[in-house]
């Protein structure tokens, strides 16, 4: 299997048309980590362990006015043994285990795929910004030299690493500006350390000690009494020339709203199969659909010669919600026809469940306006290396030529958004969503950062809302356990918790989804106790902790205020910097960003900094009140 721009597999071979067909089943379980892998690929600066005929033999470290050269061989020894060369002893504090891990990272790729991918990127405005950043980190190089080095390296093998880039560099000496490298490191890891900082606060501040008792005769996490049947259809939208495969899960005794499941980018309708069967066993009809322009099949078909702009067409931001509305129209007709499925579809009361990009679909149908204009402003302001994988994905929508687009479908009565990609897709217009909404966030999500894609959107929602936080879970923890054997599940770049260790996440997903959906039925009061913080917390174990809230406490709102002030491009909030104290916090943190070492090594320092600042903020606010 060879479609790997960032993930790792134990098998490597040239990608051909026959290989695509042979690997499509394995690919069907992968997800948007192509973006995460791509960002990591760029940070690794290179390719191919095979040395070129005129490879760089020395690496010069520059820190301000200081310079120190070291043989590449000495750096190789350091990465193998961990022993710091004598000439690098003054820089030992920078050569942390995490730095060693990054420099040692080896990425398996297919040059046939990556070369046109990078060529397309480098010719774009984002690519020009990226090359400028890399040129600053490698003084004495030009953007053209960097592109040529990538090209040379790509023709020498199918493994990427930092040392590989050095071996492909045509001059004998390569200079590395440590300050610029640190900036790149901070940009690349920004969402990771933000998640690391916010997770302990979420776990602590959302914790409850006691709660109301839940009914002893009902367990929403266990299967219901209904036998589940499944039917597969392929619907044809002739107006838009789209074939939409759907799986329908149903039982003899049907009640409640219709449930529609929308998958994420590069996934398919099977990704939440366990959840669909569970809900159907309790008498709900569930329809899971494929979005033909952004599912795994579309990705496989465009894999050979893929350009960055082709991986996710901007039109998918329009087609996805229209796919669901088209589906509901067809199900209304099917609901009236005589047969096994007659009366099975309550299309006037629909709960849409989305995962990742599918959550965008769900929220758009619930009334959030797609705002390409606001999205363009964000994507133009953020440097390529600052983007999370989810940001790369959402910025594909910036190509749409509209100011705003509305896809609200009045039949949608609820939304469940697992690990949603939201960010700046809706600008400030997420407040237009008035239907009950459940957002599920994972603290170790390497794809969708907690703050900008879940916490900020949660605060914007104005209707009935719930936030479920899974500390220790990852982007794909909520998906079917069969996905743990996928390429992304085995990735060494985007860590995923998907096997048996993620079972508490899946059990809770079944319970909370059923309890939430039942709020639209006469059994609402019976299931209400299962929407309590205490019940959700009861699923916690040594590896995962779960929290539920309908409103963020003031302590977390203050923490987020600091974040918004120091990251104005992430999301617009009202003028919260009226207080001079908050302005001081902004300046203090901005300075701290410049002096702290890369995020994985400074989490504790940043946490202490934030705790101190927020304690002072609380005291000063008390004085003002």
Where are these regions (language model features)?
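Alpha/beta-hydrolase active-site loop
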Residues: 309-343, 382
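Gly/Ala-rich beta-loop-alpha elbow adjacent to hydrolase catalytic centers
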Residues: 354-358, 362
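Short beta-strand element of the alpha/beta-hydrolase
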Residues: 255-264
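Short beta-strand/loop motif that positions the catalytic acidic residue
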Residues: 433, 439-441
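N-terminal cap/lid segment of alpha/beta-hydrolase-fold proteins
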Residues: 204-254
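Mature extracellular/secreted ectodomains of secretory-pathway proteins
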Residues: 66-71, 75-212
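Short alpha-helix in the alpha/beta-hydrolase fold that links the catalytic acid
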Residues: 435, 449-458
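Cap/lid segment of the alpha/beta-hydrolase catalytic domain
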Residues: 266, 270-273, 278, 290-319
């Amino acid at each position: 299997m060879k479609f790997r721009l960032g993930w790792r597999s134990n098998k490597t071979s040239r990608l051909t048309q026959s290989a695509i067909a042979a690997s499509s089943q394995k690919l069907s379980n992968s997800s948007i980590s192509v973006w995460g892998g791509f960002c990591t690929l760029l940070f690794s600066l290179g390719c191919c362990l095979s040395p070129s005929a005129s490879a760089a033999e020395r690496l010069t470290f520059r820190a301000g006015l200081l310079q120190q050269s070291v043989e590449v061989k000495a750096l190789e020894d350091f990465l193998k043994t961990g022993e710091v060369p004598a000439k690098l002893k003054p820089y030992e504090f920078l050569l942390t285990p995490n730095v060693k891990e990054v420099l040692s990272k080896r990425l398996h790729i297919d040059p046939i795929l990556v070369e046109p991918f990078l060529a397309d990127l480098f010719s774009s405005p984002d690519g020009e910004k990226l090359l400028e950043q890399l040129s600053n980190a490698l003084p004495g190089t030009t953007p053209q030299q960097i592109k040529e080095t990538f090209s040379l390296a790509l023709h020498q093998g199918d493994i990427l690493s930092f040392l590989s880039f050095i071996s492909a560099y045509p001059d004998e000496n390569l200079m590395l500006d440590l300050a610029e490298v640190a900036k790149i490191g901070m940009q690349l890891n920004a969402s990771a350390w933000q998640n690391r900082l916010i997770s302990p606060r979420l776990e602590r501040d959302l914790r409850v000690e006691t709660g109301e008792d839940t009914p002893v005769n009902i367990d929403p996490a266990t299967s219901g009494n209904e036998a589940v049947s499944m039917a597969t259809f392929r619907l044809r939208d002739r107006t838009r020339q789209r074939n939409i495969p759907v799986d329908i899960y149903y039982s003899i005794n049907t009640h409640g709203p219709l449930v529609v499941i929308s998958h994420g980018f590069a996934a398919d309708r099977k990704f939440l199969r366990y959840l669909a069967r569970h809900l159907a066993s309790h008498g709900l009809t569930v329809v899971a659909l494929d979005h033909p322009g952004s599912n795994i099949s579309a990705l496989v078909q465009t894999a050979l010669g893929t350009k960055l702009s082709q991986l996710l067409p901007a039109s998918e931001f329009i087609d996805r919600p229209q796919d669901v509305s088209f589906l509901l129209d067809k199900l209304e007709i099917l609901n009236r026809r005589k047969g096994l499925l007659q009366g099975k579809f309550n299309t006037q009361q629909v709960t849409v469940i989305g995962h990742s990009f599918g959550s965008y679909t769900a929220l758009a149908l619930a009334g959030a306006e797609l705002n390409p204009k606001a999205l363009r402003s964000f994507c133009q302001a953020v440097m390529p290396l600052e983007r999370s994988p989810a940001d790369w994905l959402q910025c594909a929508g910036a190509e749409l030529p509209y100011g705003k687009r509305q896809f609200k479908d009045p039949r949608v009565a609820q939304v469940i958004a697992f690990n949603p990609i939201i960010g700046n897709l809706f600008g400030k217009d997420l407040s237009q969503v008035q239907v009950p909404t459940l957002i599920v966030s994972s603290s170790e999500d390497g794809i969708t950062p907690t703050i900008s894609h879940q916490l900020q959107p949660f605060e914007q929602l104005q209707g009935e809302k719930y936030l479920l936080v899974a500390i220790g879970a990852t982007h794909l923890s909520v998906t079917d356990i069969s996905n743990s054997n996928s390429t992304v599940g085995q990735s060494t770049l985007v860590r995923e918790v998907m096997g048996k260790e993620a079972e508490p996440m899946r059990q809770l997903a079944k319970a909370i989804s059923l309890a939430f959906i039942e709020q639209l039925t006469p059994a609402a009061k019976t299931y209400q106790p299962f929407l309590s913080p205490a019940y959700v917390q009861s699923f916690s174990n040594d590896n995962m902790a779960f929290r539920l809230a309908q409103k963020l406490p003031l302590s977390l709102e203050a923490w987020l205020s600091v974040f918004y002030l120091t990251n104005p491009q992430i999301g617009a909030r009202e003028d919260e910097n009226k207080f001079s104290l908050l302005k001081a916090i902004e300046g203090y943190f901005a300075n701290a960003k410049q002096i702290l070492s890369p995020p994985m090594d400074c989490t504790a320092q940043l946490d202490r900094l934030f705790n101190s600042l927020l304690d002072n903020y609380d005291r000063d606010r008390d004085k003002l009140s």
